Amino acid sequence: MQSPKIRIRLRAFDYRAIDRSSQEIVETAKRTGAKVHGPIPLPTRIEKFSVNRSVHVNKKSAEQFEIRTHKRLLDIVDPTARTIDELKKLNLPAGVDITIRI
């Protein structure tokens, strides 16, 4: 039989915030006695946009923007009830999106 596992996916535009958050999660899980695999960096999604600088003239003049979405994956193996309680209490930065699957 497979042991219970918590899979945590983190997404953010700022890689420093996502690295800090994943480090906090790892420290919390290890402190409560669970085993942690990760953080595993997943591929960064890059969206590029080109916008004309002017409305009517200078078609060749365009500005280019990009949005980078950084992702990390954490697996917590054999979590205890204390591990889950501590993860619920964890305060993460506003720019980090977290998805937890058990």
UniProtKB/Swiss-Prot annotation:
UniProt-recorded Gene Ontology molecular function terms: structural constituent of ribosome; tRNA binding
Record keywords, A-Z: Ribonucleoprotein, Ribosomal protein
A single Gene Ontology CC term: ribosome
Top-level taxonomic group: Bacteria
GO biological process annotation, one example: translation
SMART domains from the UniProt entry: Ribosomal_S10 (SM01403)
Keyword field contains Ribosomal protein: yes
Family to which the UniProt record says this protein belongs: Belongs to the universal ribosomal protein uS10 family.
Main function: Involved in the binding of tRNA to the ribosomes.
Quaternary structure and interacting proteins, as annotated: Part of the 30S ribosomal subunit.
Name used for this protein in its record: Small ribosomal subunit protein uS10
Species for this entry: Akkermansia muciniphila (strain ATCC BAA-835 / DSM 22959 / JCM 33894 / BCRC 81048 / CCUG 64013 / CIP 107961 / Muc)
Organism taxonomic ancestry: Bacteria, Pseudomonadati, Verrucomicrobiota, Verrucomicrobiia, Verrucomicrobiales
